[in-house]
Amino acid sequence: TEHMFFEADRIKAMREMIVSETSEQREKALAKLEPIQQADFEAIYEAMKGRPVTIRLLDPPLHEFVPTDPKDIAELAKEMGLTVEHLNQVISSLHEFNPMMGHRGCRLDVTFPEIAKMQTAAIIKAALAVRSRRPAWKIVPEIMVPLVGEEKELAFVKSVIDKTARKIIKEAGSDMTYKVGTMIEIPRAALTADAIAKEAEFFSFGTNDLTQMTFGFSRDDAGKFLASYYDRKIYESDPFSKLDQAGVGRLVKMAAELGRETRPDIKLGICGEQGGDPSTVAFCHKIGLTYVSCSPFRVPIARLAAAQAAIKDEQ
């Protein structure tokens, strides 16, 4: 959902939320974003025509949204009633030495539950609105919590989601159901997937981050040395394009098995660039995953690979 916030009509409200110093200020800024998010989600539900829709909550660190241009900083300070000096201090406080492993994903919702509350409200209200217009469509929102590494972490965020969603659904007099799941992208989440499945109704294996955290190198920096690894036959392929079945794949298989032990009907899939790689799709089919998610231009390849894997399985 984070890509929705960068457009001009919404980045200001997002920045107001980030530099807010009280929950009241944050909620005021989030109230500006909620109808915008709802409209976006309604458009998604309309485009999908009743097909399953999974919406991931805010994932990246907040510093990615704050202004860096002095003119933008001065403008935001004026709108917020702050001095430029104070706003610069707030922006500096958001700096992280390792943002990939920092204050992002579900950690944002633990720190600022009002973010999860706003996004949940937008998701549920959008689904109810489209459902009222399209009664023949079976719309069951799937809300995905990113970067979970601990069962209690997901339980906390899920409690915020449930409280918000149930209230809206009850007030609407609706019988609509929804699902809450998580991304498995931290090795600890894969290792404790049986516990996490007590709270999660579905897993989506975020193979981009899971690969980074399992290998211990950043996708953004790995280009500096991976070529040498290919030349010396240490790695035969880019682990960010083709799933490393021996390491990352083993974690995925383990987590899938553990998740099914706790919740036999759990929905399992992967999302990431590897989802468009034929060998990765075949591996996912083999271990019982039910779907892959990938960038649009990789979809035809993924669909073909899924069909080939299914045919091979029948032979």
Model-derived segments and spans:
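Conserved alpha/beta-domain cores
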Residues: T1-Q315
